[in-house]
């Protein structure tokens, strides 16, 4: 079974970045998965476990170096990734909390994620809450006026989506025409 050399890792990184935007941590994870698959195949091919472990350690260090090289080259930019993803998620009705959690899961540093949420082009929390209401057909976008139990369920739905109580109440109380105008 051939070794995983730096060139193969570099090519794998380029192939991934050609198809997907990624963070440095995400790229390291992709390369790590490739190394893990190689190690599993090498073990099944009957290679010495000690030799496999040594190769995995060397390839893991090389993967970190490849990811760092991609950052230096500008192919990976965590701040740009965070800004674009925050804009997309908030525009789709995700709360600030849900967006921060998503960015953290993707490997974006907390300060970069917070800065991305403050960007000019990122919709505010109220706008995102109205989008969530429209997607779920609740609040101003409901077919009928809610009873007290229904309103409580809607508040619970928005709370589970990460919206604060004040923002959720304000969105649910917004008249339909005003909500549609805000989203237009």
Sequence positions of predicted segments:
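An alpha-helical, amphipathic repeat domain used for nucleic-acid recognition
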Residues: 1-184
